[in-house]
Design a protein with these regions (language model features):
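HTH-adjacent hinge/linker in prokaryotic transcriptional regulators
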Residues: 24, 28, 33-77
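Glycine-rich adenosine-cofactor-binding loop
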Residues: 72-112
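Extreme N-terminal segment that seeds HTH/winged-HTH DNA-binding domains in transcriptional regulators
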Residues: 1-23
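N-terminal beta-loop-helix "entrance" segment that forms/cooperates
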Residues: 113-123
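Phosphate-bearing ligand-interacting subdomains
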Residues: 15-19, 121-208
């Protein structure tokens, strides 16, 4: 699982190399850019067959394409988003879903009646009451939750009953514990911020 967590980072770094017209790179050079060891990179990539050539290194475009295939960026999973407040709008507006294997097809909010004139990436905001009809017609596969934690349980229950079992979860609701068969990627921004706090304190202590 830790290898899978690193693959999107490889994909992103390789994309930046392509933008800078770098066509090949050694594991040592890649390790210096990413803050990993060269042996870790070789070990990670060997889990999927290995893609480098001794004495040549890695073809940047080919390696990014291979990693993209492993991650499924070609899939275009139909995705709906719940909660069009500040966080939900930012994610819907600025995330490049289509470049990451997803197609954002629908937006839902409990206050959709107040958002009739709002379009986010060309999408209207639907009321939650339309969920069942919408899902039967469109058949989305993934749900993004940008709702308050207290609102999440009822929404998740409805989604699971409709056959949606894949979640990108920005709420603090523990979906996996309540629905063991689902696939969940939790995003806890507060955890990330506290990790930064620790790193700052640790660096300052070492500097003293």
């Amino acid at each position: 699982m830790s290898v899978i967590k690193r693959l999107p980072r490889y994909y992103r770094f390789l994309g930046e190399l392509k933008k800078n017209n770098i066509t090949r790179i050694s594991s040592k050079e890649l390790s210096q850019r990413m803050g990993l060891t060269a042996s870790q990179i070789r070990q990670d990539l060997n889990c999927f067959g290995g893609f480098g050539q001794q004495g040549y290194g890695y073809n940047v475009e080919q390696l990014q394409n291979e990693i993209g295939t492993i991650l499924g960026v070609q899939n275009g999973f139909k995705t709906i988003l719940f909660g069009c407040g500040n966080l939900g709008r930012a994610i819907a507006s600025h995330m490049t879903f289509e470049d990451r294997g997803f197609e954002l097809v629908g937006l839902f909010d409990s206050n959709a009646d107040k958002m009739k004139d709002i379009r986010i990436k060309g999408l209207s905001v639907y009321p939650v009451e339309d969920l069942e009809v919408y899902c039967k017609e469109v058949e989305p596969k993934v749900a993004v939750l940008c709702v308050p934690t207290e609102a999440a349980p009822a929404i998740v229950e409805r989604l699971v009953n409709l056959g949606i079992t894949n979640f990108w979860n920005f709420s603090h609701y523990d979906i996996a514990s309540n629905y063991p068969g689902v696939t969940v990627e939790n995003v806890h921004l507060n955890d990330s911020l506290m990790t930064l706090s620790y790193q700052i304190m640790n660096r300052e202590e070492q500097a003293d």
